[in-house]
Amino acid sequence: DIYNYMEPYVSKVDPTDYFGNEQARTAWVDSGAQLGELSYGVLFNIQYVNYWFAP
């Protein structure tokens, strides 16, 4: 499961560091599935491929 694998990275992201308020945090969480899937797919593509398909 890609989300379990990415958890160490995702858990370090605190939306208040960027937005600083609860409403923005909610919006961050709501949009996380789309934005997260895209950004982590790009940023961690190599690690993802190595993790699942290494010989």
From Swiss-Prot:
**What keywords does the record list, in alphabetical order?**
Allergen
Q: Which domain of life is it from?
A: Eukaryota
Anything else known: On the 2D-gel the determined pI of this protein is: 10.4, its MW is: 60 kDa.
Q: What is this protein called?
A: Major pollen allergen Dac g 4
